[in-house]
Amino acid sequence: MSDLPRHSPRRQHAGESAVTAITSPEDTTKAVVIYSGGMDSYTVLHRALRAGFEVHALSFHYGQRHSRELETAHDVCQRLGIAHQVVDIRAIHGLIGNSALTDATQTMPDGDYDADNMAATVVPNRNMILLSLAIGHAVNIGANVCFYGAHGGDHVLYPDCRPEFVERMNDVAAIADFTPVRIAAPYLHASKEEILADGLAMGLDYAQTWTCYLGAERSCGHCGSCRERLAAFAAQGVTDPLVYAGAGASD
């Protein structure tokens, strides 16, 4: 059993949107978006574009077992004609590499996306590291807002996706440089299903995303990340446009 603390997504009140406001009167026209190539950050990317920001997307190679998400992110940004950098920080792999996402000798957990099953996929301090680099880039290019794709379904498993983490990082980002930077996580209180619903309402094509923890030609359909994605599509009554190899997934 995992000894991770139990957190649940915040309960939504009647009439309350799961998508939080992403603009502030103090925002500049430029924004940095941490973009992995997955469906959460893909939806955040388009939310920022719809809000009128000049988006500068950052993707990070931190020693992941495969680069399918990064390739997907590159293709999407090229298609959209937006600034995009893939930042190679694999030098830190020896410091934070004890995760099934970064260590090919570890078994990737199958099954449901929950704390007990998915604890092996935690990369220590990942979002703090990536946000710190994104904040520095924002200051460098004259942006004062950084977006990332934390969502309510990750609160149980990933401490750096929880509301209290975002709140504290905002406090630090406001004083870490002469230029305050705001961290925005528009889906912080949303489920994967709600993120998908928002993206579908924007007309997004989720064939342009990669979710699977494995880097095969087709998504496996049985890792925790695939199962969460498939459940979101099923809940929306929509067929996932990706072609899956795993048993129980759509062909």
UniProtKB/Swiss-Prot annotation:
Enzyme Commission number(s) from the entry: 6.3.4.20
Role, per record: Catalyzes the ATP-dependent conversion of 7-carboxy-7-deazaguanine (CDG) to 7-cyano-7-deazaguanine (preQ(0)).
Organism: Chromohalobacter salexigens (strain ATCC BAA-138 / DSM 3043 / CIP 106854 / NCIMB 13768 / 1H11)
Protein residues bound to ATP: 35-45
GO molecular function terms attached to this record: ATP binding; ligase activity, forming carbon-nitrogen bonds; zinc ion binding
SUPFAM superfamilies: Adenine nucleotide alpha hydrolases-like (SSF52402)
Pfam families registered for this protein in UniProt: QueC
Family to which this protein belongs: Belongs to the QueC family.
Keyword Nucleotide-binding on entry: yes
Any one GO biological process: queuosine biosynthetic process
InterPro entries reported in the protein's UniProt record: QueC (IPR018317), Rossmann-like_a/b/a_fold (IPR014729)
Cofactor binding, per record: Binds 1 zinc ion per subunit.
Known pathway: Purine metabolism; 7-cyano-7-deazaguanine biosynthesis
Cofactor dependency: Zn(2+)
Reaction catalyzed: 7-carboxy-7-deazaguanine + NH4(+) + ATP = 7-cyano-7-deazaguanine + ADP + phosphate + H2O + H(+)
Keywords recorded for this protein, A-Z: ATP-binding, Ligase, Metal-binding, Nucleotide-binding, Queuosine biosynthesis, Zinc
Disulfide feature: none
Name of the featured protein: 7-cyano-7-deazaguanine synthase
